[in-house]
C-alpha cells in the first residue's frame, strides 16, 4: 500500500477518483486538500519522496510524475467537492501490481513500516528529539483542522514541545562520547511494527541513530546516499530513559559529583559540569593557633607584681646561702663577749627569795611547812683563802648539814683566839639578807691562811 492510501485511511477523507494506479495517486491527492503547501509541510514532512530511496528507474519515474502533478495541482478544493463524500468502507487499499520491479517491492515494505507510525503520528511529523527543518509552525495540524468540510478527529497536541526543545538543547550538549557510551550496547534494529505514538515511546527501548556522530549504516541508507540535500530521519526514537539518566547526571546540585562510569579516550571530551577542572578546590586548612597562656586567677596583690611569683611554671627562687657568720651564731665564743666597764661584770642576782619582793606571810608559811631547810644555798668559790670569781658560785638546793659542824668549829676557834674574828662559813640562805652576805664574804677574805686552805679543801669539789 502506498503512502497516499495510508494517509487517506488515517485522515478519513473520502477519495473517490483521487487514486490512480502505478503510483500516480499523490498528484491528484493534492487537490483534495485546499492548501498543498500545508499538506507538504505537515504530512510530507516525513519526506516520503526521499523515503523512496531511489531504488530503481521505475521508482524515479513515479517520483518525477508526483512532482509534476504537485506543481500542476490547483490550489482550491473544487475537485473534492465534485467527487463528494463516500463511506470509509468503499476505500480499498491501493495494491500495486506484481509487475513492478523488485525495487518497488522494497519501497512497499518500507512504506508498510510507516503505516503504523502514521496512525498516531500524522500531526507529529517527526519522531521525538529530531531537529525540525521543514515545519515552520509549532502546531502542524492546525491548518488541517480549519477545514469546514469534515472535521478531522482530535489528535493529541503535544503539551511538552518545550520539553522536546529542551531535550534537543541537551542533546546538542551531550552528543558524541556520552551518547555513544550510553547507547553503544544497542544493536541497529529495523522498523518496528505496531509502534505507538510519540508519547508512548518512553520506555520502549527504541533508538534513534540519526543523532550519532557515526551512525550505523543500513542497506536502505546506502541506497539513498546520492541524495545529499535532504536529511533522512530514522523513525525510531532514542530511549528517553537513557537521556533522562544522562540529564540527571549533568544537572542538579549533585551534577558535578556524578561522572560517567567509563570515558572513551578517543572521543574529545566536552566541557561539562562533570569535568574535574570545574570541581571546587578545598582550601588548605588553617593551622590551629597555640593555646593562649593560662590567665592569673589570683588576687591582685603584691605577690602578683613581685618578681618571685611572676612565673608559675618555675618554683620560687631561693637566694643563695651565705657563709655562716660568727657574729650571728647563737652560741658565740668568749672572745666575742662585750667588754664591761673596768672589765668587771656586775654580780648576778641569786635565785633565793628576796625579802624585798617576798612578803613575810609567805616566808612564815614556808617556815611552818618545813620548807626553811630546803632553801637554796649559794657558796662562793674560794681558792687559797681568796674568792676566785665574783660571777661564779655554787648553787646548792639547800643548806648542807655538814656546814653546821664547820660552823661549830669556827666558833671554838674564835673563842680560843678572840683577836681573830672568824665568822662561820656564810651560807646565803633564804633568810639572809644581801648586806649580811657581803659582810660575811669580806670576813672570809680576812681569815687566816690555814683556815682558808681548810675551807677551800672542804668547799671546792
Curated annotation (Swiss-Prot):
The modification Phosphoserine is found at residues 251, 272, 301, 460. The modification N-acetylserine is found at residue 2. Induction: Up-regulated by lysophosphatidic acid (LPA) and sphingosine 1-phosphate. Up-regulated by globular actin monomers, via MKL1 signaling. Up-regulated in uterus in response to progesterone. Up-regulated in uterus in response to estrogen. Up-regulated in pregnant uterus. Negative regulator of EGFR signaling in skin morphogenesis. Acts as a negative regulator for several EGFR family members, including ERBB2, ERBB3 and ERBB4. Inhibits EGFR catalytic activity by interfering with its dimerization. Inhibits autophosphorylation of EGFR, ERBB2 and ERBB4. Important for normal keratinocyte proliferation and differentiation. Plays a role in modulating the response to steroid hormones in the uterus. Required for normal response to progesterone in the uterus and for fertility. Mediates epithelial estrogen responses in the uterus by regulating ESR1 levels and activation. The gene is Errfi1. Belongs to the MIG6 family. Keywords: Acetylation, Cell membrane, Cytoplasm, Membrane, Nucleus, Phosphoprotein, Tumor suppressor. Residues 311-324 have a biased composition (Basic and acidic residues). Disulfide bonds: none annotated. Its main location: cytoplasm. This is ERBB receptor feedback inhibitor 1. It comes from the Eukaryota. Residues 228-353 are annotated as: Disordered. Disruption phenotype: Embryos are present at the expected Mendelian ratio, but half of the mice die before adolescence, due to defects in prenatal and perinatal lung development. In the 15.5 dpc embryo, lungs are smaller, have a less complex structure than normal, and present fewer blood vessels. Lungs in newborns present abnormal patterns of cell proliferation and apoptosis. Adults develop chronic obstructive pulmonary disease (COPD). Mice present epidermal hyperplasia with thickening and flaking skin and ulcerations on tail and footpads. Papillomas develop at sites of wounding. Residues 333-362 are annotated as: Interaction with EGFR and ERBB2 and regulation of EGFR activation. GO terms for biological process: apoptotic process; bile acid biosynthetic process; cartilage development; cell migration; cellular hyperosmotic response; cellular response to dexamethasone stimulus; cellular response to epidermal growth factor stimulus; cellular response to insulin stimulus. Detected in lung, in airway epithelial cells and alveolar type 2 cells (at protein level). Detected in uterus stroma, luminal epithelium and glandular epithelium. It comes from Mus musculus. It is a peripheral membrane protein. Interacts with EGFR. Interacts with ERBB2. Residues 283-292 have a biased composition (Pro residues). One of its GO terms (cellular component) is nucleus.
Amino acid at each position: 500500500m502506498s503512502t497516499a492510501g495510508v494517509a487517506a485511511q488515517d485522515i478519513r477523507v473520502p477519495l473517490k477518483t483521487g487514486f490512480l494506479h502505478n503510483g500516480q495517486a499523490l498528484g491528484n491527492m493534492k487537490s483534495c486538500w485546499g492548501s498543498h503547501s500545508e499538506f507538504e509541510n505537515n504530512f510530507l514532512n516525513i519526506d516520503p519522496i526521499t523515503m523512496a530511496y531511489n531504488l530503481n528507474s521505475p521508482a524515479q519515474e513515479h517520483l518525477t510524475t508526483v512532482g509534476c502533478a504537485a506543481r500542476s495541482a490547483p490550489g482550491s478544493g473544487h475537485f473534492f467537492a465534485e467527487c463528494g463524500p463516500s463511506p470509509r468502507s468503499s476505500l480499498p487499499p491501493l495494491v500495486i501490481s506484481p509487475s513492478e520491479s523488485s525495487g518497488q517491492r522494497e519501497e512497499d515494505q518500507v512504506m508498510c513500516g510507516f503505516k503504523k507510525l502514521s496512525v498516531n503520528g500524522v500531526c507529529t511529523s517527526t519522531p521525538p528529539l529530531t531537529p525540525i527543518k521543514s515545519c515552520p509552525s509549532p502546531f502542524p495540524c492546525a491548518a488541517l483542522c480549519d477545514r469546514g468540510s469534515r472535521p478531522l478527529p482530535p489528535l493529541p497536541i503535544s503539551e511538552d514541545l518545550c520539553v522536546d526543545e529542551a531535550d534537543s538543547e541537551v542533546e546538542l550538549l551531550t552528543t558524541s562520547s556520552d551518547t555513544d557510551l550510553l547507547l553503544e550496547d544497542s544493536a541497529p534494529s529495523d522498523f518496528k511494527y505496531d509502534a505507538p505514538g510519540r508519547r508512548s515511546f518512553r520506555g520502549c527501548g527504541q533508538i534513534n541513530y540519526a543523532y550519532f556522530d557515526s551512525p550505523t549504516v543500513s542497506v536502505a541508507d546506502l541506497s539513498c546516499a546520492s541524495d545529499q540535500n535532504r536529511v533522512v530521519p530514522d523513525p525510531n526514537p532514542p530511549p528517553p530513559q537513557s537521556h533522562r539518566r544522562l540529564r540527571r547526571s549533568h544537572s542538579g546540585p549533585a551534577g558535578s559529583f556524578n561522572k560517567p562510569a567509563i570515558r572513551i579516550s578517543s572521543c574529545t571530551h566536552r566541557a561539562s559540569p562533570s569535568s574535574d577542572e570545574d570541581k571546587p578546590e578545598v582550601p588548605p586548612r588553617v593551622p590551629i593557633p597555640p593555646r593562649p597562656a593560662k590567665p592569673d586567677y589570683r588576687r591582685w596583690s603584691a605577690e602578683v607584681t613581685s618578681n618571685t611569683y611572676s612565673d608559675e611554671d618555675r618554683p620560687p627562687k631561693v637566694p643563695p646561702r651565705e657563709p655562716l657568720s660568727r657574729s650571728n651564731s647563737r652560741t658565740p665564743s668568749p672572745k666575742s663577749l662585750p667588754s664591761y666597764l673596768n672589765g668587771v661584770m656586775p654580780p648576778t642576782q641569786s635565785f633565793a627569795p628576796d625579802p624585798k619582793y617576798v612578803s613575810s606571810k609567805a616566808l612564815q608559811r614556808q617556815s611552818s611547812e618545813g620548807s626553811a631547810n630546803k632553801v637554796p644555798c649559794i657558796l662562793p668559790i674560794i681558792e687559797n683563802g681568796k674568792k676566785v670569781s665574783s660571777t661564779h658560785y655554787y648553787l646548792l638546793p639547800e643548806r648542807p648539814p655538814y656546814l653546821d659542824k664547820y660552823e661549830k668549829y669556827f666558833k671554838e676557834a674564835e673563842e680560843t683566839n678572840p683577836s681573830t674574828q672568824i665568822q662561820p662559813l656564810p651560807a646565803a640562805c633564804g633568810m639572809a639578807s644581801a648586806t649580811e652576805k657581803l659582810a660575811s664574804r669580806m670576813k672570809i677574805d680576812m681569815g687566816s691562811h690555814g683556815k682558808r686552805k681548810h675551807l677551800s679543801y672542804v668547799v671546792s669539789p
